[in-house]
UniProtKB/Swiss-Prot annotation:
Its main location: plastid. Gene3D superfamilies: Photosystem II CP47 reaction center protein. One of the components of the core complex of photosystem II (PSII). It binds chlorophyll and helps catalyze the primary light-induced photochemical processes of PSII. PSII is a light-driven water:plastoquinone oxidoreductase, using light energy to abstract electrons from H(2)O, generating O(2) and a proton gradient subsequently used for ATP formation. InterPro entries: PS_antenna-like, PS_II_antenna-like_sf, PSII_PsbB. Binds multiple chlorophylls. PSII binds additional chlorophylls, carotenoids and specific lipids. The keyword Plastid applies. GO terms for biological process: photosynthetic electron transport in photosystem II. Belongs to the PsbB/PsbC family. PsbB subfamily. This is Photosystem II CP47 reaction center protein. Keywords: Chlorophyll, Chloroplast, Chromophore, Membrane, Photosynthesis, Photosystem II, Plastid, Thylakoid, Transmembrane, Transmembrane helix. It is a multi-pass membrane protein. It comes from the Eukaryota. It comes from Draba nemorosa. The lineage of its organism: Eukaryota, Viridiplantae, Streptophyta, Embryophyta, Tracheophyta.
Amino acid sequence: MGLPWYRVHTVVLNDPARLLSVHIMHTALVAGWAGSMALYELAVFDPSDPVLDPMWRQGMFVIPFMTRLGITNSWGGWNITGGTITNPGLWSYEGVAGAHIVFSGLCFLAAIWHWVYWDLEIFCDERTGKPSLDLPKIFGIHLFLSGVACFGFGAFHVTGLYGPGIWVSDPYGLTGKVQTVNPTWGVEGFDPFVPGGIASHHIAAGTLGILAGLFHLSVRPPQRLYKGLRMGNIETVLSSSIAAVFFAAFVVAGTMWYGSATTPIELFGPTRYQWDQGYFQQEIYRRVSAGLAENQSVSEAWSKIPEKLAFYDYIGNNPAKGGLFRAGSMDNGDGIAVGWLGHPVFRNKEGRELFVRRMPTFFDTFPVVLVYGFGIVRADVPFRRAESKYSVEQVGVTVEFYGGELNGVSYSDPATVKKYAIRAQLGEIFELDPATLKSYGVFRSSPRGWFTFGHASFALLFFFGHIWHGSRTLFRDVFAGIDPDLDAQVEFGAFQKLGDPTTKRQAV
């Protein structure tokens, strides 16, 4: 036929069985990729330290999605929360991966079968004997089945009626585990951070889908609407399907980047806004203040801060710090976190406590400034020492650590103080191992960043695809050069441009 590469899909335009075949093959490829990717990730994943080396630091992409749906055990004998298990059951990480690969193989065989046996009675119109599809009826069937799946997920899987539940955690990502969730039917169900909304919205949307599917199965569209929306044209289906996909992609890009109950920070890492707003820093100070109010010493109060909470308050875990095109996991950027050194408290000669101004998200370098009270600069690490007034040496800054590995240790040596002041710009200070993965200090993004970038990019691309195919199906007659009100007999093939006698073909 000599079709250009961008038009090869026209071969299934009027061939319903082979249209079905290529869609089954697409499902085979998607399921096969998911299963294979899961097995690859399981081969390289280190589950030994869920606090300082969680899945999102290691660049895992499909494991977080499996985990949020209730998979926590491995046939390797480990649990995602760090424990060991003896009976992981069938639906472990490996079991789910294997099921996807088996399903992929079955879809592959089904696709071949439907490609070979394309001339089936079911695809023939009884009146004309030609292949045709009743698209409004197929729409009703798909809507009904997707409604059943949606309702079933919300009513059974999420609630635990028949299923494990989903991953639920506290606002600071410390106590996450898989648990059952009751539907939330009040206005709080619209809060994107309330897990109960996941159950209730799936139940409601599924019910609506079932009812809408039954409606479209039992009621035929009016002729004027059928013709106006080109409901008999398969390209209309393509256009509206692309619309559904790009809309969903935009939504999930938002819920991933800004955070929601469906994207827990324990599985995908913190959001950039939690760094920008000092979210974890405020919680840490609140806990320390509460400890001091209970007559604990400063050292005791800081020692009770969970290492997990302190680790979130580190700029290296900010997904916006990694470049979009820097390959590799976060561990490949700054190294594998080994331990929290503790919270550094800086003081000048007068004993005033100084605070290091933290680096904003979109800076790679930032002046090291130590402030007192309401932002009064008391010390810095100057760019030009000849003009300095507030250098660590001149001001006489010391640093003392509370909590962590250096609890109770203090330094007055200016070089050491400056080293820790520079590191305090990046949040809480951690010992990192750059040698194991040959990490060279350039931050990487987390799976949260990759997912957002990928889905936002493809959503934009698919938006233009929707416009393109929607225009083609609505204005098909215009693009083909046929006037819809044309009364004259048109001889196809007589003219280079249809119906234009000035472009009469020359006989060869």
